[in-house]
């Protein structure tokens, strides 16, 4: 992500898949990528899985941290360090909002987030959790949340996909990507399948 007017660039680094390492978290550059500073680091076992910037205010950032470890015979996705963090000052300071009202309790796995360009304060999240996995929404920059869909088709292989994307022009349209492409036009209440050339949908971008 980047604020092109100030040459600020942000990178969400998930880190090494097979063991602990320090190259995880959120990194920030203020000179177009020449130099970098780590601005959010949870631990050597947990990295940043997703990152979203508010197009209306690029100082607002939200990220998800995923505790995970992969080996040749298994994948452990989730743990007590997984969570959601938000910054209102361009990444200088971060607040852990994982336990804010409305979010699911219990251990979290991989999560995706997307700030709506069409409605101030609205953020979408798709959350892998041992309790109440689903799509969540906030209208006040993460202070309180509500579960808007517990459709398990939206959680296909969440440790592998887990991407959500807010439509840039319609506040009630949101996309969820996994082995299928899902689209909602009613604020997340219902989703329909959108045909794609291949059943492996990791990301989406819409020209604003």
Language-model segments: what does each one mean?
Residues 3-208:
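Beta-propeller blade termini and top-face loops
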């Amino acid at each position: 992500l980047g604020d092109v007017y100030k040459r600020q660039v942000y990178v969400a680094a998930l880190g090494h898949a097979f063991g602990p390492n320090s190259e995880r978290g959120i990194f920030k550059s203020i000179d177009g990528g020449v130099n970098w500073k780590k601005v959010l680091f949870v631990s050597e076992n947990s990295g940043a899985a997703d990152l979203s910037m508010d197009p209306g205010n690029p100082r607002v950032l939200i990220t998800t941290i995923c505790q995970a470890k992969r080996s040749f015979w298994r994948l452990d996705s989730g743990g007590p360090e997984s969570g959601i963090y938000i910054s209102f000052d361009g990444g200088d300071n971060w607040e852990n909002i994982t336990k804010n009202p409305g979010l699911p309790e219990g251990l979290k796995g991989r999560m995706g987030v997307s700030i709506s360009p069409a409605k101030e304060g609205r953020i979408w999240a798709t959350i892998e959790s041992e309790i109440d996995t689903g799509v969540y929404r906030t209208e006040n920059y993460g202070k309180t949340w509500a579960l808007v869909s517990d459709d398990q088709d939206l959680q296909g292989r969440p440790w592998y996909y887990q991407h959500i994307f807010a439509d840039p022009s319609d506040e009630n349209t949101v996309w969820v990507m996994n082995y299928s492409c899902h689209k909602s036009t009613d604020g997340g209440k219902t989703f329909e399948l959108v045909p794609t050339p291949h059943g492996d949908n990791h990301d989406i971008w819409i020209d604003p």
